């Protein structure tokens, strides 16, 4: 089956923003006396921010400030860091051009809110490449439920089984696989060898590898048949 669309996760896949979330969460939680660690924050990678804050509230049961206040403060800091320090992940622009030239539709399926998406698109100037953008903000359930990816496929008008999803988080991979998509995992360097990422059909270290994988016949972006798993 020919792949007709590539749907990207956002944070940690198209932009180097994953550390911004950890920094913001540690700073905001610490401000209100909540003792969090980087490892704790990373456990929730790929999860939408309201679900993250709700998870920690269920454990720590703080009374003030409200979850909404904490969410807004985290979002403000992440947006600031995207504007000041955000960079495209290596190989992104070349891959977007390759997909566009090959008439492959490009989508986005992210746990981040649309305000974060807007900041990323503005910083990287890549909005014109995307046929459809879907945030968990639009869905009843966030990742690992399939809703975000199914919604993205619907927006770009492609059967989910003809979509390739690129993810950096285990939570995101579960979402894309539940949606029936061919999956590529791109974990951060420190997590690359973790067994959990083997649920993906393929695993890469950089977006630069996707074009080469297509040339090698391991994808079906142009003329090849993807490896079944």
Where are these regions (language model features)?
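Active-site neighborhood of HAD-like aspartate-dependent phosphohydrolases
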Residues: 1-42
């Amino acid at each position: 089956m020919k792949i007709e669309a590539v749907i990207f996760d956002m944070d940690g896949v198209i932009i180097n923003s994953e550390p911004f979330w950890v920094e913001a969460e540690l700073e905001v939680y610490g401000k209100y006396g909540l003792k969090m660690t980087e490892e704790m924050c990373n456990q929730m990678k790929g999860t939408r921010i309201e679900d993250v804050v709700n998870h920690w509230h269920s454990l720590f049961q703080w009374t003030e400030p409200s979850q909404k206040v904490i969410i807004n403060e985290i979002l403000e800091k992440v947006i600031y860091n995207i504007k000041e320090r955000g960079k495209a992940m290596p190989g992104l622009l070349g891959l977007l051009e390759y997909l566009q030239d090959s008439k492959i539709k490009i989508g986005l399926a992210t746990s981040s809110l649309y305000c974060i998406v807007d900041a990323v698109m503005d910083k990287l100037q890549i909005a014109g490449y995307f046929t459809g953008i879907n945030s968990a903000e639009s869905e009843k359930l966030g990742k690992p439920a399939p809703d975000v990816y199914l919604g993205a496929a619907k927006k770009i008008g492609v059967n989910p089984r003809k979509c390739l999803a690129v993810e950096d988080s285990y939570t995101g991979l579960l979402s894309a696989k539940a949606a029936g998509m061919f999956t590529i995992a791109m974990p951060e360097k420190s997590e690359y060898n973790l067994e959990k990422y083997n649920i993906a059909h393929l695993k890469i270290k950089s977006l630069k590898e996707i074009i080469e994988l297509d040339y090698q016949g391991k994808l079906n972006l142009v003329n090849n048949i993807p490896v079944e798993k």
